Amino acid sequence: MLHTPIGRLRTMGFIEGMSLLILLFIAMPLKYWAGLPLAVTIVGSVHGGLFILYLLVLAYATFSVKWPLKWSAAGFIAAFVPFGNFLYDRGLRNYK
């Protein structure tokens, strides 16, 4: 899966998507319900780094595959929506 630019993007999208879900559904409740703001600090920092890495891999895939702008824009928007990367991955799975 890591042998192609799209495979790398799919892998990074999964990792970044999981970090967003961990931030939203584990770290945020720990901050507000359990009074542990350090959880958001740590997970948020990791997620931020993964998000930047995801954008770099998205740019790499965009220029390597030379696909239309709509695929790049969809990948960018999907990164901001919970479960968005997983839906985007469904489209990438069938991309030739």
From Swiss-Prot:
Please provide, in alphabetical order, the Gene Ontology terms of the cellular component aspect for this entry. plasma membrane
Which UniProt keywords are given for this protein, alphabetically ordered?
A: Cell membrane, Membrane, Transmembrane, Transmembrane helix
Q: Does the keyword Ion transport apply?
A: no
Q: Where in the cell is it found?
A: Cell membrane
Report the transmembrane regions from the record: 14-34, 38-58, 67-87
- One Pfam family it belongs to: DUF3817
The record's section on PANTHER family has: MEMBRANE PROTEIN (PTHR40077:SF1), MEMBRANE PROTEIN-RELATED (PTHR40077)
Q: Using the UniProt record, give the first listed, main subcellular location.
A: membrane
Its recorded name reads: Uncharacterized membrane protein YdzA
Membrane topology type:
Multi-pass membrane protein
